[in-house]
Amino acid sequence: MGGVFELFGEGQRFLQFSNLRAGNESDEGNAATKLDLTLATGNNSTLFDNLAGEDRTLQSARSAINLLTFQCFAPGGRIGVAKRNGKETAGKGSSNHAPCTPSSMVHTLMLGQNLLETIHQNLLTRESVTDSYGPNGWGIPAWELPVEKREDKTAVENSTLTHLGRLVPLSRAIRLNDGGFSIILANGLEYPIFPAFREATATVIKRKGELAILSASTNRSLWRQLAAVSVRRQADADATSGPLALNRLRPSAETNIWVGALVTDKAKIEDVVESTYSLPAGMFSEFGRASYERGVAYAEELEGGLIQSVKTYASALKVTSPAYNRARQQFWTRVEQHLSALFDLARNTDLAADLPNCPWGKAVQAAAFDAYDQSCPHQTPRQIEAYALGLRKLTFRPKNQQPTPLAHE
């Protein structure tokens, strides 16, 4: 059993396929740095990697981390064809996303005081796994039932359709050479994605009446989606929920979380987004989440008013390219400096009854005025007149309604 955690040597290896050979004898393989998504290989940018053209040998510890990360997050696209047990690997040169990448899915982890506590907080109970994946969803680690050939249905299903099997995926057929500087790389196992299988760290929401995975994007900050992330899964109820590990928590105080995603456009990695937050206990109650969501919606409403103001200003001056992007960036940058006031809405839901006059509402209004002021010059008489016209759009009318629970709960 100990050999399955070795990076090199004959036989079974850690997150690598045994009996894997290059597709043809002249194939020199890929650089091992291709497994490191932070380095310049393939479609990855060279912006932060000045050694892209040189042969590099990675330390074994880093290679192990790279293997696990790549098997979880490798984007789909064209890939090499290798031979295993004399047969070509699947896909005919194509590959799908690794299991943690589809839809740029948002992943959430509970954070403890140290690594051991963090691991413990993210473990799932058998009850939770059975509720989410069915009576056969627990499985066994992939190294205890290795996939020796594609036709081995039992081993393939264990690796791709069970909780323990998917924790160490084999989405790519990889074999490190003994020097650690090159690899054989081809398509591996196919991992069903949502709705056939949901990742334990993902969040399920309702979008246009249908269940979907919560996605990240580069133009929408993660804090704007925390109301969905903080929903606990209810057995025999609606499947919308945040990460399954939330079921084990009974928060009476702050809960620290890490939220992140690999943002992709087809086979291209666009960016990595991540943040850490300390969620008040109110975020795990219906009314607390509803208040928080109303606060986010209020900011988005004011963003819309800001854009209309910039449009009015630009129209008056006959500007062909209004400064929409600049205004948005200025607005959200200022808003994010006041997130503590937004979390206060979950702590004290009474504040959401009068959003424009609570600290969060006032901070958002000030951010909108500041962003408009910075994006629309007002020095000449014509500019001042246009500025005044746009300023009239920045009106904030209180909406006196009590917070209600989220519709997707």
Label the predicted regions.
Residues L51-E54:
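Flanking scaffold residues of small Cys/His-coordinated metal-binding clusters
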Residues Q59-R62:
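Short Cys/His-rich metal-coordination motifs, predominantly Zn2+-binding knuckles/fingers
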Residues A64-L67:
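Short functional micro-motifs and their immediate structural scaffolds
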Residues L47-D49:
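Beta-strand elements of modular eukaryotic interaction domains
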Residues M1-G42, T69-E409:
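Extended alpha-helical scaffolding segments
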